[in-house]
Amino acid sequence: MKCAHFDQQQCLSCRHIKQSMSVQVAAKSQVLSQLLSDFEVEQWHEPVFGPDSGFRNKAKMVVLGAAHQPILGIVTPTGEPVSLCDCNLYPEDMQLLLHRLEQFVRQAGIPPYNVDKAKGELKFILLTRSQIKGEYLLRFVLKSHKSIERIERELPKLLSEYPQIKVVSVNIQPVHMAILEGEEEIFLTEETRLSEQFNDVPLFIRPKSFFQTHPQIAAKLYQTAREWVAELKPSSLWDLFCGVGGFGLHCASKTIPLTGIEISSEAIACAKISAETMGLTQVDFTALDSTGFAQGCDATDKPDVVIVNPPRRGIGESLCQSLSDFAPKAILYSSCNPHTLAKDLANIQGYHIQKVQLFDMFPHTDHFEVLVMLVKPS
């Protein structure tokens, strides 16, 4: 992928952009192999990768500059603001909309938040795109309520030009800290969620719910998990750190009870809608801490198969101990951090690694997703 911003040293996020995808994936595979070198792996599956441009479905833009000349992008290593509306990680239609949003901010006259002076109103613009319909969820992160009227004044014109914008909200983040969003979310549209679909599973996105940023690879990851779980013929499933339900809903059926646990109530609300849409009745999605949930269950509640998809910190020693004690016949672990994955695998007792597969969800970076299946020795 070519990038003028990288060539000019304005944005260095895609640090491996000059390497081919095959070289990038080979390097990531080597890292993963080294991190898991202390474990016996029965099957190494071929890495999965896809498009290296036009794939990303979410933009997190810092709003810089001034009200009369706003810039959506980042601050360069030398301290200059630069627009990233034409970043090639985004689909072309998304790039065009980002340029239009710069114009929107200018027309609305909203002063960008100046971190050094702690003045201004508009901190971030967050844009999420649904791959299934090309529809959008648009969020304005403001310091206060002062500029909401300005957004509402210009919004009808924007929505008439871009009817594919289905959800618009304002998030209030009042503190002078490096925090992306605050607690208060104000919807400016009747719709409050974005429709998406991976494979044959309907999924829904709300402003604060986590969602994978590379839809093509995420779909393959979910499908692989579905196939691996199907081989196990489970009688019951847990999906911990379930988010909007992507893994569990791919693996569940009308005859297999599924328990999904996620700390975000917004994500759980989306997961419940998906389950209802799919006609799944033996499903229980609950907003709880996954570690606390597992610790509060007794042996009679233990699942046949457990899926975990934790944040970068991993599942931690307590949950590793709970899983070891429950001793399900298999554990599927999807990780975005191979370092914490290796640490957790060492703390889960009584299993061997049957399968490992790398999914390159983050081209041009050092990051990747990995799916591991742990089974009890026969």
From Swiss-Prot:
Active-site residues, Swiss-Prot/TrEMBL: C336 (nucleophile)
Protein origin, superkingdom: Bacteria
Any one Gene Ontology BP term: rRNA base methylation
Keyword hit for Lipoprotein: no
GO molecular function, one term: 4 iron, 4 sulfur cluster binding
Keyword Iron part of the UniProt annotation: yes
Binding-site residues for [4Fe-4S] cluster, renumbered to this chain: C3, C11, C14, C87
NCBIfam families, A to Z: meth_trns_rumB, rumA
Function: Catalyzes the formation of 5-methyl-uridine at position 747 (m5U747) in 23S rRNA.
Protein name as it appears in the record: 23S rRNA (uracil(747)-C(5))-methyltransferase RlmC
